[in-house]
Amino acid sequence: VPYEIAILILFVIASVVAVAARRIDLPYTIALMAVGIVLGALHLLNAPHLTQELLYDIFLPPLIFEAAIHLKADDIRRDFWPIATLVVPGVILSTLATAAVMIPIGQHLPQLHALNWAVGILFGAAVAATDPVAVVALFKKLGVPQRLRVLMESESLLNDGTAIVIFTIAWAFIHGDLSTPQEAVIEFFRVVGLGLLVGVIVGFLTAVATQNLDDVMIVITLTTVAAYGSFLIAERLGVSGVMSTVAAGLVVGQRGFTNTLFPSIRLTTESFWEYIAFAMNSLIFLLMGLAIDLQMLWRLWPFVLLAYFSMLVARFIVVTGTWGLFYPTRLRFPFRWTVILGWGGLRGALSMVLALSLPESFAYKNLIVTLVFGVVLLALLIQGLSISPVLRWLGISTSLSEVRSYEQLKTRITLLHNTMDAIDRLRRRHMISARSAQTLEDEFQKQIDGILQELQKATPDKEALLKEELIRTKRRLLMDQKNDLFELYRNGTIDYGTYEALKNEIDGQIFALENEGA
């Protein structure tokens, strides 16, 4: 199949899988990987050839930039030291701990006996990058404390950059470009520091350029240039492109998406980046499923389990150590959160990009790809599917069944009130007799009274969920205002200038609500 047709087919498959996964309430990424495995096993579609340049230069920048523009600098600043501890020492320790568990045991296993420290660190860095997108989405749904969500999101974004830098340095050791640990430490701080500097400059220039713009196409173009430009410029200068894109995204999100940018343009731009991230994630998970060697995965399943538990143990050591370090300070967080930070740190797209980016000539490529794929798959299946019960067990969230029951009762109330309105309309139009209307109203009113009693008992006693309900209701009312405003413009009651000014005002209120619920 030609390259272009293969990509088109993958997008069609991703769309179908997304719809199906939503209907059966299955995490989208798990469904994509499963479909990719089936397609690869049946040889229904050959995976397009992926080079390191394609994976790094095309896939990474939008994934990193989209995550960065949604983070608030104030939230990161408030918990900067715990986040920084998880991101730099945490990722380094996690990488080393994973390698330290793998290598000694691997010496006694035929498939892993030749594994050395450089290759072990390469694997450790690949699985140190967390991808908790599905978990954070569930957090919002279940009313998990905002500070825990911020810790999870911020740490994930920033540790991606650290993991990639360590991965690159480990590869430089294997390739012979670095020879001593001292050189590695100097190289680490050089590529990270200069990468952040490049990103700040690109982000600041983009923020200045987008101020007061009223053309959404130009804003989207400029942010696209910022995402790819920050990455490519940094890479050409020999520093970290990922750290550069992280910095550019944070600056654009903080300074570019301020009150100087029209709210409607801001919302459209954010929607564009959410779509791009969705598209890139979809392709990566499908391609990983297509690229995996199932026979090798089957042969290596004990080592995949070893790799998974090594990664999990390393993760819990890091988050527990961070909790202990900050427990005596005002930055402490509950011990229960360490379980969620450890268990919710799923592995995903970035880990697979790093594994796939290794050159075909590298002797351990198939081994690392298989181990990383197995670790990602186990993390999604074991941690991804169990995070909701774990949250409930720890008392951090309301159960999903409670939330659904609450939502269903409210929906039934709405439907019954609509039915009562319909009966009233039929009576006023003399389409049914007053007696029949009264009989029907009495019947439906009894149902409403019964559901109201159930609703009082079922109301989740979680402040965050009630706050979410309020935000959602306000948003719906504001969207109704937008629709009414458009009707006034469409029928000629108001001119375009008035319509645009009032629409921006309403969009500003919607955007403020989105931030309030973020």
Regions found by a protein language model. Give the residues of each.
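Short alpha-helix boundary/capping elements
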Residues: T398, F444, I448-L452, D507-F511
